[in-house]
Amino acid sequence: MIQLLKKEDQFNRTIFNGNFLANKPVANGTKDNVKPYSSLFYWSHARAIGDCEFGLHPHEGFEIMTFILEGNVSHYDTATKVWTPLETGDFQVIQSNSGIEHSERISKGTRNFQIWFDPNFYEAVKKAPSYTDYHSKDFKPIMEDGIKTIIYVGKGSIANVLTPGLSIKRLFFDKKAKYSLQLDKNSSYTFYVLKGDTVIDGNALTSDDAVRISNLENLEVEFEIEGELFYIETPLVSNYKMIWS
């Protein structure tokens, strides 16, 4: 199964008087084509046109990850009780568990992903919350199947996460070429085009477009010039009930 999610078909939102623009390939309660699946509940790509601040607000149960694609974010939460700076290439993992509150200050020009997972909500709320920063220096690119790859989460990563069967990677393509990506037919994937124009399994996509994939073992990817893909892999079938189901 391949489902295209062009930027204009995602859930798009503007807040803070036009200073914060978000396109969301996964968002609960908005549009049927971007509804949650597997353990992936929410995925937002945001651009800060001006400085923005989200005041202290609560979360529980979900595992929430923020990836700084460019720019700067300062984060405060009630687990650490300090403001923590995050820069380009860094990411954070909030295991909100029994409950946590946090604030975010986002600098002008920043782009980031915020992604929520259900790690088994009904069990997570029995655990104490935690917050962990990870820095770009600890995630050097490697060559995987002939493609320059950063492994954020999954086998080969130092990141500690609760969500079972989760893999998150960033792929860099530096020349015109065709690639055949090996997929697991027992997994679901969403690929997000971070940079460049690409053709994925015969479908033309550009920056900020996305594609959902399942029940495939191979994926043909072609870039005309350099480009980047960011993808999330989760189990096709989970062994626990999701909070939204």
Language-model-derived ranges and their functions:
Residues S96-K126, S214-I243:
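Ligand-binding loop in jelly-roll beta-barrel domains
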Residues N72, K195-D197, E228:
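Structural motif
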